[in-house]
């Protein structure tokens, strides 16, 4: 679920404010996405978007009311390390790994302030 993804980012980047820092960044961070990612961090978001799209197509994730944004899973955080719980069902495990991989990707990618609130109509 999206609120868990925010918590995961705070795990890999302590002191960050995921909603303020990463929402509306580049062409893919935030709602929707199009065009070519502007940098490594934006590529993390594109990959995460694609991962959620793939989750919706999984047999184990036949969403009715649930979707990757609201479907919750179980995970733990220890010293910036995220572990998805082995007790998650197949769908929860998939979404947890989407979020885990993106949070790790975010933590390794440089942050370019000029890509925050980018004019997506012009650059994406």
From Swiss-Prot:
Active site: 48, 99
Cystine residue pairs: 11-77, 27-124, 29-45, 44-105, 51-98, 61-91, 84-96
GO biological process: arachidonate secretion; lipid catabolic process; phosphatidylcholine metabolic process; phosphatidylglycerol metabolic process
Alphabetic keyword roster: Calcium, Disulfide bond, Hydrolase, Lipid degradation, Lipid metabolism, Metal-binding, Secreted
GO MF entry, a single one: phospholipid binding
Enzyme Commission number(s) of this protein: 3.1.1.4
Compartment(s): Secreted
Residues holding Ca(2+): 28, 30, 32, 49
Top-rank taxon: Eukaryota
Cofactors (names): Ca(2+)
InterPro entries membership: PLipase_A2 (IPR001211), PLipase_A2_Asp_AS (IPR033112), PLipase_A2_dom (IPR016090), PLipase_A2_dom_sf (IPR036444), PLipase_A2_His_AS (IPR033113)
SUPFAM superfamilies assigned to the protein according to its UniProt record, in alphabetical order: Phospholipase A2, PLA2
Main location: secreted
Comment on bound cofactor: Binds 1 Ca(2+) ion per subunit.
One GO cellular component, as annotated: extracellular region
Reactions this protein catalyses: a 1,2-diacyl-sn-glycero-3-phosphocholine + H2O = a 1-acyl-sn-glycero-3-phosphocholine + a fatty acid + H(+)
Additional note from the record: This isozyme constitutes about 5% of the pancreatic phospholipase.
Role description: PA2 catalyzes the calcium-dependent hydrolysis of the 2-acyl groups in 3-sn-phosphoglycerides.
Family: Belongs to the phospholipase A2 family.
Name of protein: Phospholipase A2, minor isoenzyme
